[in-house]
């Protein structure tokens, strides 16, 4: 019998059983006694054998394929994880990082969740068709970097709509009337939200987007560079929009390299605004104007949300969106 089956038999949530097994506050004495009695009667391991001197939290990094977003995005996700683990440690928890492949069948089935009190899911690469699999997690969990629309999960992520608005508002303020879209070809929830926001705010700020101005690029600097060169070789210079918004900095930087390789001046011939503010964006030449999102804040908020859920079984599931700010550098200019 596992913790989920035990909880169903008693008529409480797995989170409530976990609280009792770990001798933590947040459950009434009556409920605590009922659960302990059921544990003894069922033969399930007694609470005293499950009590841990240090409260363990599982950091579950979910990776799809090569992990273009979690492994190759210049430490964006890594900074979130570091901030989350540091905050958990400060609160007296012991976080353990585990990497799982999303394309592995039954990837959650062999995880010993009973060793942990809660799970923080690094959900950057989890696709919509995979959202429901997280229902298998029998203990409290918080999803990070994916708002999981349609699911009643606690989540902490990026306010993609507002952050895209910030970027396009600046493009309009600079005087641009037409904008291109360097769209990620990678299927991720964050990118889907940015796509919807891009077209919504392009219309709001009267920025023309031609059908051919949407260019799908891989979220890898080298691949985006090669793909953008192919695009430029098939288009005349006067056909290229004077400004582009990119789904993330990796794509923007790859495209910028391709523009320079094909003798475009940035921002004189073409301007670019990115999204994420990864470290290289500040030191490349020209430096990249981009929307900065605090990775540290996302991590800290996720850790605090996890802690609050564990301390209070009545804690409501919360979805928290983190806004950003524009970092103006030299890849954009006032347009004539």
Residue ranges: model-predicted function:
Residues 56-169, 173, 233, 250:
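Alpha-helical recognition/docking segments in bacterial nutrient-uptake
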Residues 62, 66-76, 97-104, 156-166, ...:
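Hinge/beta->alpha junction and helix N-cap segments in small-molecule ligand-binding domains
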Residues 13, 45, 117, 176-178, ...:
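Short acidic/polar active-site loop segments enriched in Thr and Asp
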Residues 60-63, 122, 144, 181-182, ...:
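Short hydrophobic segments within beta-strands
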Residues 233-336:
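Flexible loop/turn connectors
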Residues 38, 83-87, 133, 193-205, ...:
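Alpha-helical structural signal in soluble globular domains
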């Amino acid at each position: 019998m596992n913790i989920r089956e035990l909880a169903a038999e008693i008529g409480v949530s797995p989170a409530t059983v976990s609280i009792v097994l770990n001798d933590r506050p947040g459950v009434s004495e009556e409920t605590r006694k009922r659960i302990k009695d059921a544990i003894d009667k069922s033969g399930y391991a007694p609470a005293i054998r499950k009590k841990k001197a240090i409260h363990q939290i599982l950091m579950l990094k979910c990776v799809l394929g090569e992990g273009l977003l979690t492994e190759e995005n210049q430490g964006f996700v890594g900074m979130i994880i570091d901030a989350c683990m540091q905050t958990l440690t400060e609160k007296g928890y012991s976080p353990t990082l585990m990497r799982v492949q999303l394309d592995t069948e039954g990837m959650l089935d062999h995880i010993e969740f009973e060793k942990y009190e809660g799970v923080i899911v690094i959900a950057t690469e989890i696709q919509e068709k995979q959202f429901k699999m997280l229902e298998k997690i029998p203990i409290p969990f918080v999803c990070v970097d994916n708002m999981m629309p349609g699911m009643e999960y606690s989540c902490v992520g990026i306010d993609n709509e507002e952050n895209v608005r910030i970027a396009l508002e600046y493009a309009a303020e600079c005087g641009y009337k037409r904008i291109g879209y360097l769209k990620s070809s990678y299927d991720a929830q964050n990118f889907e939200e940015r796509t919807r926001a891009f077209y919504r705010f392009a219309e709001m700020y009267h920025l023309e987007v031609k059908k051919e101005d949407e260019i799908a690029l891989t979220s890898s600097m080298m691949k985006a560079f090669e793909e953008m060169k192919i695009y430029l070789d098939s288009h005349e210079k006067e056909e290229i929009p004077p400004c582009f918004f990119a789904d993330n900095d990796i794509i923007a930087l790859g495209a910028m390299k391709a523009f320079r390789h094909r003798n475009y001046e940035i921002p004189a011939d073409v301007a670019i605004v990115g999204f994420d503010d990864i470290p290289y964006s500040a030191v490349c030449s020209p430096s990249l104007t981009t929307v900065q999102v605090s990775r540290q804040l996302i991590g800290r908020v996720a850790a605090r949300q996890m802690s609050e859920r564990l301390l209070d079984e009545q804690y409501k599931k919360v979805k928290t969106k983190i806004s950003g700010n524009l970092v103006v550098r030299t890849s954009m200019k006032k347009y004539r």
